Design a protein with these regions (language model features):
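Outer-membrane beta-barrel biogenesis signature
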Residues: 20-79
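Transmembrane beta-strands of outer-membrane beta-barrel proteins
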Residues: 65-70, 125-127, 189-195, 214, ...
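Residues on the lipid-exposed face of transmembrane beta-strands in outer-membrane beta-barrel proteins
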Residues: 69, 113-119, 127, 178-184, ...
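Outer membrane beta-barrel transmembrane domains
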Residues: 234-236, 240-372
């Protein structure tokens, strides 16, 4: 399942937040001179809309356009379920109980470029263009009924592994998207609510992966003595929602090494379990065979073994594999802390760290701003 699962599950979460800039309402007695200069100043740029009016009300606006470049590293745990697999364009087997994923971890290294502009004094709009190198590691097993026994006249069984495997996939991806950031600042304190939508193209997927990211932030900017120079600190959250359905088709040659041997071993174990469950049933008395719980346990175990055996038998003759599955982040939210140093109103450098919630990420970036 090297690409059936892993290439499909690796969602590209390298789309970081924009540099932390905002329209700041100047307040306080120490800022009286700055307020006076803002109230009479002519705003020289086309954007944002209402820029001159807001400036005269005492807001210090950032330059209206900019471009930023960011490097993003991220590691995230994934959950996979509702797996269906078919072979040679045949019928799909529902294998959610049969194939179980133990660990699925996606690691991404990416660079994104973001051009942006302020449409209104409190609304920033930006585009996203990104490239990434990705790696997904998954451990999984094929399970079937086993450990058959009779306890007080009742048939019992447990799920047991008939095949264990793990693999790592590596691939490149390209993303495009757009975002909006409503934000407000008063006296150096600020709130920002970053939202973006991206479409990520992975050659092995039938359709692009769609991702929505929401990142609320709350912070404070501290001014230095040098004009226009400051440092901002913030905390916040990072929420990821992605389209969960994934489907595609792959050649068996792209599967894990030793696939044929693993399938053959799995078939032998399933055949052995089928013999055991029949012996288990035959050991019951006629009265015990009429118990509803025994009938249910016997028919259920036979059905599950039948599905596992049919899937493995089809896999042993397969040249291609078709699949459907659902995947999602183990946790949608994680916590973030960040900082930005503004050298002047043109140049900023920032860093942000995300952790907790089964996701760890690091973002570093450089931004250049200009009037438009």
């Amino acid at each position: 399942m090297k690409r059936i699962v892993f290439l499909l599950l690796s969602f590209i979460l390298f789309i970081g937040a924009d540099a932390q800039i905002y329209s700041d309402k100047v307040v306080g007695k120490n800022s009286a001179q700055e307020l006076d200069s803002l109230s009479v100043a002519e705003y020289p740029y086309l954007l944002p809309i209402w820029g001159e009016k807001v400036t005269q009300l005492g807001f210090d606006l950032p330059y209206s356009a900019g471009v930023s470049v960011q490097y993003v590293w991220q590691e995230s745990d994934l959950l996979i379920d509702n797996l269906q697999v078919g072979f040679n364009n045949g019928n799909l087997f529902a294998l959610d109980e049969i194939v179980r994923f133990k660990n699925a971890t996606a690691i991404t290294n990416g660079v994104n470029v973001r051009p942006d502009f302020w449409l209104f004094p409190f609304l920033n709009i930006y585009g996203i263009f990104a490239k990434s190198e990705n790696q997904t590691a998954v451990d999984f097993g094929v399970y079937a009924p086993g450990s058959f026994e009779v306890v007080d006249g009742t048939l019992n069984w447990e799920w047991e592994s008939v095949m264990e495997a793990g693999t790592t996939a590596r691939f490149d991806a390209t993303s495009i998207g757009f975002g909006v950031t409503p934000t407000i600042g008063v006296g150096g304190g600020f709130m920002a609510f970053d939202m973006n939508f991206t479409w990520t193209d992975i050659p092995e997927l039938d359709k692009p992966a769609k991702i929505f990211i929401f990142g609320p932030r709350l912070g404070k900017t501290f001014q230095f003595k040098r004009p226009q120079q400051n440092i901002a600190l913030w905390v916040g959250g990072f929420r990821v929602k992605m389209n969960s359905g994934t489907s595609g088709s792959l050649l068996v040659n792209d599967l894990i090494p030793g696939f044929d041997e693993l399938v053959t071993s799995g078939l032998e174990k399933v055949d052995q379990r089928q013999q055991e469950v029949d012996e288990w049933w035959d050991s019951l008395s006629d009265i015990q065979k009429k118990r509803p719980e025994n009938i249910r346990n016997y028919t259920t175990s036979k059905a599950k073994l039948g599905v596992a055996g049919a899937a493995l038998d089809a896999a042993s003759r397969a040249e291609s594999v078709e699949y459907n599955l659902d995947k999602r982040p183990e946790n949608m939210w994680n916590f973030i802390v960040g900082s930005q140093f503004q050298y002047n109103k043109n140049m900023m450098v920032r860093a942000e760290m995300g952790f907790l919630g089964a996701r760890t990420q690091l973002i570093v970036g450089l931004q250049y701003r200009f009037g438009l």
